């Protein structure tokens, strides 16, 4: 159910509804499930009053959208960014519900956060904000109820402050947050999980659609947007495998490398971002050019693999056309809803045209590695044990392979297209239908629709 002025949520709902149409035509009883699943189970909105370093009271809006618990405790990140509003959090929680279903783990869907901006704030100000935020949120979360995590603006520092506040308020040490430090309940591979998982998913896509562009070849050219956690570890995994990364970006522009990034340079980017710096300051390095106000997609003449990793709606229709002209074969979202609806239409039309077309993977499938390892962190916490890096990475690879297989099968069966050997199935339809069926069936079994 869309309220007025919720464009992001409307976009996510429209995408799901369109993808589900062939399935709903064949199974009309599920139309009632769609009507009900789009309404969050609970929406929490509260004020967050905190003291800045000058002793002045500041106020922000706090939110938690507890979207769906049919498959397990609500699970989804906390976003701290000035753009945060209810429409964005409803869209993210809605997407999270079906993304979590695709991991095969027992997790429901949720999302939360605040319009607080951690940029430019001191550690003390962030700590005071986090303690105030948790002062309300703690009533509504817990390891078997709702398990938040990090997101944009919420890194290890913020998770630590939030965990500490909860521990003081509840007087208990539980796994009620994921993304924790390794010495106090965190999991190996969690920081890397979204980026690594994206590449594990993309490797399956490449093997089926365009093995000539495998990631063990330096001649395979990869464009990545963003420069935060997702983009950094996506780039590091691509470089480790042997392909060439040509771009990163931030909110002010894009940094393009003619010869390709190195692991050392990505680590330099990570250090810069920890200090709140801009990629523009690295443009003087040899072979790196900064383009203010532009995203990477129109700046590179040849791209084989495009991986949006910044934020929602970061690939427009015009940029999608530019990617087609650059020869792109795979577009997989590291960000949530990274492509606009018009851009997705262009990619899907290219896929339907046959050999040489673009194969597009939506974020709910391709970037589910992050929440998958959050689920593995929950499992480790519940058993009071810690798995090794190799164990977690192996489980992540298995989850991404299973997710790819589920999406491929459902896309083949329910896309409503007359597929031939030359036309690839729609992973967009596959992800939406497979995730929806799993959630809807659980809801029906629990009496949420009939």
UniProtKB/Swiss-Prot annotation:
Record has Hydrolase as a keyword: no
UniProt keyword list: NADP, Oxidoreductase
Classification via InterPro entries: Aminoacid_DH-like_N_sf, Glu/Leu/Phe/Val/Trp_DH, Glu/Leu/Phe/Val/Trp_DH_C, Glu/Leu/Phe/Val/Trp_DH_dimer, Glu/Leu/Phe/Val_DH_AS, Glu_DH, Glu_Leu_Phe_Val_DH, NAD(P)-bd_dom_sf
SUPFAM superfamilies found in the cross-reference section: Aminoacid dehydrogenase-like, N-terminal domain (SSF53223), NAD(P)-binding Rossmann-fold domains (SSF51735)
Disulfide bond sites: none
Signal sequence extent: none
Catalysed reactions, as listed in the record: L-glutamate + NADP(+) + H2O = 2-oxoglutarate + NH4(+) + NADPH + H(+)
Record-annotated active site: 111
One term of GO molecular function: glutamate dehydrogenase (NADP+) activity
An annotated GO BP: glutamate biosynthetic process
Name this protein carries in UniProt: NADP-specific glutamate dehydrogenase
EC number: 1.4.1.4
One Pfam match: ELFV_dehydrog
Family: Belongs to the Glu/Leu/Phe/Val dehydrogenases family.
Any Gene Ontology CC annotation: cytosol
Subunit structure: Homohexamer.
